[in-house]
Design a protein with these regions (language model features):
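Conserved donor NDP-sugar-binding/catalytic core segment of glycosyltransferases
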Residues: 94-128
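Active-site-adjacent helix/loop segment of glycosyltransferases
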Residues: 210-287
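A conserved acidic beta->alpha catalytic loop
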Residues: 22, 36-47, 63
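Short aromatic/hydrophobic "clamp" motif used to bind/position activated sugar donors
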Residues: 83
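Short, flexible, basic/aromatic active-site loop/helix in glycosyltransferases
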Residues: 132-166
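A short, conserved alpha-helix in the catalytic core of glycosyltransferases
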Residues: 159-161, 165-186, 190-217
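Glycine-rich, basic loop-to-helix element that forms the pyrophosphate-binding segment
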Residues: 61-78, 99
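Short, acidic, metal-binding catalytic loop of nucleotide-sugar glycosyltransferases
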Residues: 21-31
Length: 333
């Protein structure tokens, strides 16, 4: 078996049907198997997939334990030399998967490959090329170039040997040898959702190069997000679950100091955010608490983030999944 394609399903059977259909249409040069790990099984919802693609292996999880745990179950069952972790809301439209495997075969120094994300009109989705680009956006700082240059100067320097090399693969498409995935320690099961791909990329980059190539691309439809942000502003721009996962990645990859520095940034911003609003309201003849929804929402989110500090610092095995009442973005809809 050349390739195992692993999907994590969460109410995405319709996307998955069309994705698998596109794979059989465009992946004809390699033997491959498809494994689906279902985090939210609805009896009968997968019938059209299993009827048309009866060789699909379908594993049902007892609970929705997140992306990493599901991927690891698929990885354990994989028989292919190569494994491709692929989102259900994607479509193959050319020979990109064959091209990706060819790159791995020809360049053994590469540990894993990503793919460029295309929209339906085949224009590219923007994404974070490097981990420093993502780390920079975790801070709440003025957008003036002086602050941005200062922040970049404080982050560890990133050195890439070619235009294709990166240290951050987007988890919608990650291809590697199965033995490479196992050697890196597989997916970190402390992550529930989000940022697990960045953390995994960090460990994979210690084994070999991570790359994007122009001839490896997939359409990414970007399905529904149960942690969609609401009431977005420059300061209040983080989803709680996404930010918990981002902070976990920082803690695991860069240590407790890097994690605490980001939280300190938020702690400094909070009173300033309130004071600015008070002054603004007074100058306009409004009451102090007029239109302070964003300040209140930001305060509530920080309360949740700070409540996880003990677990983040100790880092014992723990699934960092927020409680329903902590999903403030959903509650605000």
């Amino acid at each position: 078996m050349d390739l195992t394609i692993i999907f994590v399903n969460y109410k995405s059977e319709n996307y998955l049907y069309h994705c698998i259909q596109s794979l059989y249409r465009h992946c004809k040069e390699r033997s491959f198997e498809i494994i689906v790990v279902d985090n939210f099984h609805v009896p009968g919802a997968n019938q059209s997939i299993l009827t048309e693609f009866p060789k699909t292996q379908w594993f049902i999880q007892d609970t929705n334990s997140g992306f990493s745990i599901a991927n690891n179950r698929g990885l354990a069952a994989a028989k292919g030399k190569y494994v491709l972790f692929l989102n259900a809301d994607t479509l193959a439209f050319d020979n990109s998967i064959e091209n990706a495997i060819h790159h791995l075969e020809q360049q053994p120094e590469i540990a894993a490959l990503g793919a460029y994300q295309l929209q339906e009109d085949l224009t590219r989705h923007p994404f974070y090329w490097s981990q420093n680009q993502l780390r920079k956006d975790l801070y709440i700082l003025p957008s003036h170039p002086i602050f941005q240059k200062l922040l970049f100067s404080l982050l560890p320097k990133e050195h890439f040997q070619s235009a294709e090399e990166t240290n951050n693969l987007v988890g919608f498409f990650m291809l590697m040898k199965k033995e490479t995935a196992m050697r890196a320690g597989a997916w970190d099961e402390d992550f529930f959702l989000y940022a697990e791909d960045v953390e995994f990329s960090n460990r994979l980059s210690k084994i070999g190069k991570l790359c994007y190539f122009e001839d490896v691309q997939m359409i990414h439809l970007v399905g529904n997000n149960p942690f969609r942000r609401t009431k977005i502003s420059f300061v209040n721009r983080f989803s709680v679950q996404i930010q918990i996962s981002n902070l976990l990645w920082i803690r695991k990859s860069y240590g407790s100091l890097a994690y605490l520095i980001i939280l300190s940034n938020y702690a400094i911003v909070l009173p300033g955010y309130w004071i600015w609003k008070f002054i603004n309201n007074i100058s306009k003849g409004k009451s102090l608490l007029f239109n302070t929804e964003n300040q209140i929402l930001f305060s509530r989110k920080l309360f949740v983030l700070f409540s996880y500090i003990p677990k983040m610092l100790i880092l014992k095995d723990f699934l960092f999944q927020i409680k329903p009442e902590e999903n403030i973005d959903l509650k605000e809809k």
